């Protein structure tokens, strides 16, 4: 009987989680799966069936042919597994499988309950094979662990050891095209599995996008699927040195695969987009595409260095798109919080650019996948090597186009017996601000700021939530009376705004001191996203006295956004770096943010990532420094075109030697900053100290213009002393 037609059992291995998809693929190749185990399927078929799997399986890891089973006589605790493996190896005549002039290697895998030193046991298996050859033919084969002609896969079990010929040789996920690597790559067979699970071919997309392409694995695997390119067409296999190899059969299968690929290339292909913020990744993608044999298709593939914030207009309104990506979930990014912000930002971009289109996104934690706005989402858990990953599949939801809260708010009659004056004033303020907020798309603003002496509080609107700060009453005021009045105010706030209790966040603000300025108020972490201009910003209404966004500096931030294009921007006392964020989104050549607090710098990075910008990147476009601003200015020499300084009134942080007083120290601070300002640059200086006066020395040294009125929005017109601001330039520019 022709050995190529003989039925044998073969083991087809795969990554954990791929068993179902692999079974579907194998059965589509015309082979029946007879048994299924974790990470392994068993088939019964001919050599042609095995060869077809080697050639065409995009998901399998290895194709193994069991050659020899060594049954154990006893399984007591004191067993010597390594010696058992040696006995099993020497008991079989390996010269029947391959020639002594061939090189070979051993891959040993032990079942979980088997305790064995795998390195030593592998050597004993090698000894057994070599000794078997010496007994049979008097010659021994050589070991080659890097590129062996024959690989023997050995499974050490509880009742038997199984010795297999690895027909695949190297793992099947190694297609041969990955010449250049990036951090945290996805294995080729996992990428293919994700594409097959997502039904890429059936969807017949006109656009295929990977916005964080790394080394280009998804793009290349998609090309292979859509051009009917067999993954085994150009790679080496482990059966060429096997005595049972049918060369003619294999060559016929290769010819068939090549013909199918050539025929598929005649069909139209989608437009491919491969983007990454890292130029090295872009270069790796291009080189790997060429190595995969798709150089002629480069005209259909746009490979560019782009951040998420720099997406072009894809013109996808009337086209079918497919989006797939493996975001840098730790290896190329920072902490979990920044990763969550990345997924939030990616989700928002998908909703804006690709609503109702299908996407498949990898996440390292399920919580990251959960923020993706998908209809009818599905999740697949896989192992990428030793790393568990979650793949979220689904149709991108339509973007929710929201209007500012005041745009839809209508004044209603409100009767508050003991707080009628307050209710009337709040309603009057909201009515006055409504037109402006609607026209300018203002989502965050101050509605009330201690307008009435009996109601000493501030009411700030953040999207559809309120932040109510009760200023600590003077000691002469009865605490119970103050508490009652505050509760009356809260009732009036709910009545006037129509917001529920769970949308109102309450804090008590005492007079600012150096130690409590940024003191954490609770252990909650309830950040949410608000919009300001082009920027999405994370705010927190529960954990700190300040929310992450100083509303009174809105106009200054928007001004910086307009002036920043092409400029190098420096932000001192940057807090959550929202001014830097506006500068970056406004097209700044670079941004540098300096603050003493690591907490707020981490928050800053989350804001940047949320908006699709890179942080801690090799090109140093957006940099963050945890440092005292005085020391930082003294130590560096870089020049900046645009500088913003918004220092605290007073500070005596443990990290800062001595104290900072804005009135006392602003002269030396501004002079140091001006040394870092380019000759035609602009420095904006602002602070919230009500009694602040700009020193005459600064006015004598530089061109100084107070611009306070230009930086206070309509919501703060009732409190002209909320801050003061100056525009400072080197003399002779005006």
UniProtKB/Swiss-Prot annotation:
The keyword Methyltransferase applies. It comes from the Bacteria. InterPro entries: 23SrRNA_methyltr_KL, DNA_methylase_N6_adenine_CS, RlmKL-like_Mtase, RlmKL-like_Mtase_CS, RlmL_1st, SAM-dep_methyl-trfase, SAM-dependent_MTases_sf, THUMP_dom. Coiled coil: none annotated. Pfam families: Methyltrans_SAM, RlmL_1st, THUMP, UPF0020. One of its GO terms (cellular component) is cytoplasm. The keyword RNA-binding applies. Residues 49-167 form the THUMP domain. Its EC number is 2.1.1.173, 2.1.1.264. HAMAP family: 23SrRNA_methyltr_KL. NCBIfam families: PRK11783.1. This is Ribosomal RNA large subunit methyltransferase K/L.
């Amino acid at each position: 009987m022709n050995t190529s037609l003989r039925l044998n059992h073969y083991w087809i291995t795969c990554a954990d989680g791929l068993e179902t998809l692999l079974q579907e693929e194998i059965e589509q190749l015309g082979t029946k799966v007879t048994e299924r185990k974790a990470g392994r399927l068993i088939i019964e078929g001919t050599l042609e069936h095995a060869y077809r799997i080697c050639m065409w399986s995009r998901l399998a890891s290895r194709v193994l042919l069991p050659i020899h089973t060594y049954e154990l006589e006893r399984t007591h605790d004191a067993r010597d597994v390594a010696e058992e493996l040696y006995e099993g190896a020497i008991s079989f005549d390996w010269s029947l499988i391959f020639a002594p002039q061939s090189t070979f290697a051993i891959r040993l895998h032990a079942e979980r309950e088997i305790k064995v030193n795998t390195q030593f046991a592998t050597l004993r298996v090698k000894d057994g094979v070599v000794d078997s050859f010496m007994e049979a033919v008097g010659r021994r084969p050589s070991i080659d662990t890097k590129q062996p002609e024959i690989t023997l896969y050995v499974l050490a079990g509880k009742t038997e050891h199984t010795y297999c010929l690895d027909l695949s040789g190297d793992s099947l996920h190694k297609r041969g095209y990955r010449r250049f690597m990036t951090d945290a790559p996805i294995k080729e067979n996992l990428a293919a599995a994700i594409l097959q699970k997502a039904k890429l071919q059936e969807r017949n997309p006109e656009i295929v996008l990977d916005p964080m392409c790394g080394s280009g694995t998804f793009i290349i695997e998609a090309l292979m699927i859509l051009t009917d390119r067999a993954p085994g067409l150009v790679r080496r296999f482990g059966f060429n040195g096997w005595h049972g190899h049918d060369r003619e059969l294999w060559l016929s299968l290769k010819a068939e695969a090549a013909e199918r690929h050539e025929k598929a290339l005649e069909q139209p292909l989608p437009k491919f987009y491969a983007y990454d913020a890292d130029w090295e990744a872009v270069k790796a993608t291009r080189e790997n595409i060429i190595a995969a044999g798709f150089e002629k298709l480069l005209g259909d593939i746009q490979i560019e260095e782009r951040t998420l914030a720099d997406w072009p207009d894809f013109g996808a309104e009337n086209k079918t798109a497919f989006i797939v990506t493996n975001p840098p979930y730790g290896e190329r990014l920072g902490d979990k919080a920044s990763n969550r912000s990345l997924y939030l930002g990616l989700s928002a971009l998908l909703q804006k650019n690709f609503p109702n289109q299908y996407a498949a996104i990898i996440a390292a934690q399920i919580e990251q996948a959960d923020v993706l706005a998908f209809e009818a989402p599905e999740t697949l858990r896989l192992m990428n090597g030793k790393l568990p990953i979650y793949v979220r599949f689904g149709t991108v939801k339509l973007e929710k186009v929201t209007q500012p809260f005041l745009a839809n708010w209508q004044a209603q009659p409100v009767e508050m017996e003991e707080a009628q004056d307050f209710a009337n004033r709040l309603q009057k303020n909201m009515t006055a601000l409504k037109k402006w907020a609607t026209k300018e798309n203002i989502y965050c603003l101050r509605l009330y700021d201690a307008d009435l002496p009996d109601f000493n509080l501030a009411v700030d609107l953040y999207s559809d939530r309120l932040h109510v700060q009760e200023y600590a009453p003077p000691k002469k005021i009865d605490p119970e009376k103050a508490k009652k009045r505050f509760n009356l105010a809260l009732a009036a706030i709910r009545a006037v705004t129509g917001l529920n209790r769970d949308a109102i966040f309450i804090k008590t603000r005492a007079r600012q001191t150096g130690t409590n300025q940024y003191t954490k108020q609770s252990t909650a972490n309830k950040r949410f996203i608000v919009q300001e201009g082009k920027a999405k910003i994370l705010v927190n209404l529960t954990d700190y006295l300040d929310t992450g966004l100083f509303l009174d500096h809105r106009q200054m931030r928007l001004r910086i956004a307009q002036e920043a294009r092409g400029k190098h921007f420096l932000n001192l006392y940057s807090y959550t770096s929202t001014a830097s964020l506006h500068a970056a989104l406004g097209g700044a050549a670079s941004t540098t943010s300096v603050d003493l607090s690591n907490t707020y710098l981490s928050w800053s990075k989350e804001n940047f990532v949320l908006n699709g910008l890179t942080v801690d990147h090799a090109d140093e476009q957006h940099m963050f420094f945890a440092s005292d601003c005085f020391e930082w200015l003294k130590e560096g020499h870089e020049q900046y075109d645009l500088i913003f300084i918004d220092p605290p009134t007073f500070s005596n942080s443990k990290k800062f030697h001595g104290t900072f007083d804005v009135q006392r120290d602003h002269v030396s601070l501004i002079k140091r900053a001006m040394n870092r300002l380019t000759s035609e640059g602009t420095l904006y200086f602002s602070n919230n100290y009500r009694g602040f006066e700009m020193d005459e020395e600064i006015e004598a040294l530089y061109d100084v213009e107070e611009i306070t009125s230009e930086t206070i929005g309509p919501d703060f017109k009732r409190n002209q002393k909320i801050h003061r601001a100056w525009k400072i330039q080197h003399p002779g520019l005006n």
